Amino acid sequence: MRWLPFSALLLWALCLHSASADNNGVKKMKMQFATGPLLKFQICVSUGYKRVFEEYTQALYQRYPDIRIEGENYLPLPLYRHIASFLSMFKLLLIGVIILGKDPFALCGMQAPGIWVWSQENKIYACMMVFFFSNMIENQCMSTGAFEITLNDVPVWSKLESGHLPSMQQLVQILENEMKMSMHMDTLPPHQS
């Protein structure tokens, strides 16, 4: 009985520690080391946009060989990361308790609810349901739907604002316009006061 509050506190601390690693554990995808402008993609990897990023990168390198392209995961809000991390740990704890057959409600002096009795009679199904239901919620918390593009730290496309991915033609047109604009700005004489 004494270990229950301590283990809950320890589990919560582990969840917060693993979710607080913000960008430290995020793998950056650098496709080439060039000297030109920097095109940066922030994408939702769990949404399947990594393949789109790789296809766009190949096509853009063929068209603009001097461009630098980087891609990284667009992280959700910290609250959602903490919820997903907590669910991940809680899921493992709950599956362990189901497999061991220990009644946590008896430790608290409560009568076990019907769903707990069912989970003890059907351990495999109960563990599968906990695993898949928890994974569904975790994925929902971690999915941002983002496909954000910046050129030299200037936003040029946002799927979060537009609601759709840019076509390759749209992306090339945007890059052409941005590069022409920056070339035009570089050729202007400095303003004297």
UniProtKB/Swiss-Prot annotation:
GO terms for molecular function: thioredoxin-disulfide reductase (NADPH) activity. The keyword Amino-acid biosynthesis does not apply. The keyword Transmembrane helix applies. There is a cross-link at C44-U47 (Cysteinyl-selenocysteine (Cys-Sec)). Pfam families: Rdx. It is a single-pass membrane protein. Belongs to the SelWTH family. Selenoprotein T subfamily. Selenoprotein with thioredoxin reductase-like oxidoreductase activity. This is Thioredoxin reductase-like selenoprotein T1a. The lineage of its organism: Eukaryota, Metazoa, Chordata, Craniata, Vertebrata. The gene is selenot1a.
